[in-house]
UniProtKB/Swiss-Prot annotation:
Protein name stated in the entry: ATP synthase protein I
Keywords annotated in UniProt: Cell membrane, CF(0), Hydrogen ion transport, Ion transport, Membrane, Transmembrane, Transmembrane helix, Transport
Pfam family, one: ATP-synt_I
Lineage of producing organism: Bacteria, Bacillati, Bacillota, Bacilli, Bacillales
Listed transmembrane segments: 13-30, 33-53, 97-117
Subcellular compartments: Cell membrane
InterPro entries: ATP_synth_I, ATP_synth_I_Bacilli
Highest taxon in the source lineage: Bacteria
Single GO biological process annotation from the record: proton transmembrane transport
Amino acid sequence: MDDPKLTFSRQRKYLLFILAVYVLGYGLTAYKTVFLGLILGTVFSLFNFLLLVRRMNAFDRAVEKGKSIRSLGSAARWCNAILAVAVAYKNPEYFHMASTVIGLMTIYPVIMIDSFIQLKRSSMEER
């Protein structure tokens, strides 16, 4: 199994690559509001991912010391998502609402696809 820091670093790199593609889409196409919504949602998704990584590291340290931790910070991530949707709702001339929500969910397919790829790699190495 991979080191969690390597996994998080790889997933962060994938998310930044997707964000760069969205920025190119904003600059090169006529769908400005759609790509701006994707960018907004993905930036908040990246921030939520970084919050999750930070909380998971704190959780690991607490487990090593035999202490308990209250939560993994779901409330903070929900508040960030609500903030992103509120920004898109207040500024529909700049941000497409549906693409903002899609951008917020960008990290989840990245995590799943990365996990699937790593599972395939590890099964290929065992053969």
